[in-house]
Structures are given as structure tokens and as C-alpha cells.
Design a protein with these regions (language model features):
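Conserved beta/loop motifs at nucleotide-recognition and modification sites
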Residues: 1-177
Length: 179
């Protein structure tokens, strides 16, 4: 992130499309890591854990070989309000050298968790818009794409994707293979 932008202690990324949400998490983590070595800064908490204790433990661990830590916990939507309580308690007084990236995925996010993140951080809505906003969303993604499409090709691609616009990144990656 640029020095002008604040780095929050916590981010919650949520969205209905798994691919779009994953892309948003990847972009956010890259922004948070900046020029640092991701292997020294980023810790992915195993999604198989049945509790959020591993995420809380990782978030409470100070950085060792870097100035900051970025802890990513995916699938936090599968936990109940009671199960999320330790994470909510951590967010009341987060470690200043850690940024916690929580990824919704699966289930309803506990309201207390969403509110705790809002108090100290930022909620990222990673959904795909509808109508005209969807066209603008696609145009933005195509502008940053590794291939250039004219307006007619972009319209055909949009029609082909329909409601599954989360596949856009994969299709653009495949197009590079065939060039």
C-alpha cells in the first residue's frame, strides 16, 4: 500500500462469487505486503481448522523477520457467533503489527464479527455488480487484462459469460496460452 493509505488491523472480504472473492483477497494481500517478501510476511491459516483459535494465535504472534504480518483466514462464514467470539475479542485490541484478512465464504457471517471488523478495519464487498455497473466492472477488468479486446469482442465475451463473470480472469489467462 502507498504510504498515504492507512493499513487497518483487519479486513473482511466477502462476496457471492468464489473466484471474484479470491481475486479480491489476492489483490488486497499483495497491496498489504507491498515490496516485502511474502514468505516472511504472510501466514495462511489452514481452512481445515475447526475453530478460529489458529487465526487468533497467528494474529497475536508478533512479526519475526519483518515489520508486519499479514494473517489470512478463509471460510470464516462457517463459524457461529459463539465460535467467532475469540476473534471478536482479539479485534477489540488487535496487535498493531498484524493485519488480519478474513475471508467470508460459506455460511452467514456472524454479525458481531462484521461489526468488530468495521470498528477497527474495513469490509471489502467483492461481489459482481448487475446491470450497467456490471458492464463497467467488466470494462475495468478488461482494461487491466494482458490482452486487448475491441468493443465487439468485449460484448461477445460478456454475453458468453452471462452470470458467471467470475470466470473472466481464467478466460483471459487461457487466451495468453493461445496467443
Amino acid at each position: 500500500m502507498s504510504t498515504a493509505e492507512a493499513v487497518f488491523p483487519a479486513y473482511l472480504v466477502r462476496g457471492d462469487d468464489a473466484t471474484v472473492t479470491s481475486d479480491a483477497v489476492k489483490a488486497l494481500v499483495a497491496e498489504l505486503v507491498g515490496d516485502a517478501d511474502p514468505s516472511l510476511v504472510v501466514e495462511e491459516v489452514a481452512q481445515e481448522d475447526d475453530t478460529l483459535a489458529a487465526a487468533v494465535d497467528a494474529a497475536q504472534t508478533p512479526p519475526f523477520f519483518a515489520d508486519r504480518r499479514v494473517v489470512v483466514a478463509r471460510g470464516v462464514g462457517r463459524f457461529t457467533t459463539q465460535e467467532a467470539a475469540p476473534l471478536v475479542a482479539y479485534l477489540a485490541d488487535p496487535l498493531p503489527t498484524t493485519t488480519l484478512v478474513l475471508v467470508g465464504g460459506g455460511g452467514q457471517l456472524p454479525r458481531a464479527l462484521v461489526e468488530a471488523v468495521r470498528r477497527v478495519g474495513h469490509v471489502v464487498e467483492a461481489g459482481v455488480p448487475t446491470g450497467r455497473a456490471r458492464s463497467a466492472w467488466m470494462a475495468t477488468r478488461l482494461k487491466d487484462a494482458p490482452v486487448r479486446l475491441d468493443a465487439q469482442a468485449a460484448a461477445l465475451l460478456g454475453a458468453h459469460l452471462g452470470d458467471e463473470v467470475g470466470r473472466l480472469g481464467s478466460l483471459l489467462d487461457l487466451s495468453l496460452i493461445h496467443i
